[in-house]
């Protein structure tokens, strides 16, 4: 749910509306965001009149499973949900925090779609086209950089934010567990230009705890 200012975001009327939207989504998970917006339009209009600025029900994400864990960053603007195969609350919350901080796009390199791979290959090819190196060397350079890119955007291959010496995949193996599904949502995602370094913020929180 988007509003225009932090002032309204802290308003109790806005918070209550967000909770109402959340409850409605939980009860009507199969409905699209457009259907949910239509169903709650009168409540939205009433809120707009109270707070004096526009409010939009913009996006919803949901995942399934028997073992669900969540993490919401301290600023309340970004959070994640993780579904594990087996119950492990500490592990689930740690991975949800990692997803919030590191923003993986896929679970594993094998899950990356062909369009994303092709787009990155084109970028890499443009970077090395003027290197005057032999073709086989250029191909190896592109392959190496592409594999690095795929690892960086894949949750399982990312260094664990609480212990960068190991990966999410290794932690899961240590606990004999696996990720069924995950999702991450950020306020204003796709709207705001400013980027937040949540990984650094999480590290700072850990050091102060």
Located regions from the model:
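N-terminal assembly/interaction segments in proteins that build large macromolecular machines
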Residues: 2-209
